[in-house]
């Protein structure tokens, strides 16, 4: 069971909010009363759930790349979240075969950047 009071007013920083699962997470968190900031690449498909649900109108949405440590760290620390949910990734197996370096940079080093940036947040 979900304690809806837990999420009410919580500052949640969500990576990957333009993807399918991240979009659903943004909608869910918003419905529970969280203050959500999303950070992700532009929506990966057209149409996308992100655009169709107009998620950028209900949360603070920033288009950016987790591989850019300085931009990501500034965005995260400026928001000063209570909770960080990391959903940004390159999830496609075929794409990983075609672009293994980009997949590694995003999924491994991007996650390192998220964790390194989180260390600078006093509320996390």
Model regions and ranges:
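N-terminal Rossmann-like NAD(P)+-binding domain of SDR-like oxidoreductases, especially those catalyzing
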Residues: 1-124
